[in-house]
């Protein structure tokens, strides 16, 4: 029984982007460019967060991005798996590129650890579940992030539903 519809949203620190004159990303390529500029500026070493923990977290990230790349899981009209294709390759490549801007322990980071990185002020860009956004603005958020409560923004440009 479905109990919740959820969506991933691009979440970003507008204070960091504004400080560097970076427009809010609208594509993963722009997200990579923004991450590179943030790292080069010295503001953050690992500006991208992601729930890439080995297991279902990593699989869910692949599934959502694969669908976003236009991938189909099965050959039309069959039960034959069809992820070994250009869409699958593009998805894995983009995930790899994003991981270069993540905490070196990214394969241990689930949604909880990724949220903790955000709350500590260590991350400026990440996809996060809509159901977790409220907690990112909660009372236990680092003072550097709290001061941006009114200026940070959640974009649904990368939004994909998962039931």
Task: Set out the residue ranges of the language-model regions.
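Extracytoplasmic/periplasmic solute-binding protein
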Residues: 1-3, 8, 32-80, 87, ...
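A structural signal for short loop-to-beta-strand junctions that line the ligand-binding cleft
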Residues: 1-17, 46, 151-152, 157-162
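Aromatic-glycine-rich donor-binding/catalytic loop that engages nucleotide-sugar donors
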Residues: 14-26, 100-103
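Short helices/loops that flank or line small-molecule/ion binding pockets
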Residues: 16-17, 36-41, 112-126
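Short helix-initiation/N-cap motifs at beta->coil->alpha
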Residues: 26-33, 105-120
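Glycine-centered hinge/linker elements that transmit conformational signals in sensory
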Residues: 34-37, 77-108, 149
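Short, solvent-exposed loop/beta-turn-alpha elements that line the ligand-binding surface or hinge
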Residues: 52, 69-90, 138-147, 152, ...
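Beta->alpha turn/N-cap motifs
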Residues: 111, 128-133, 154
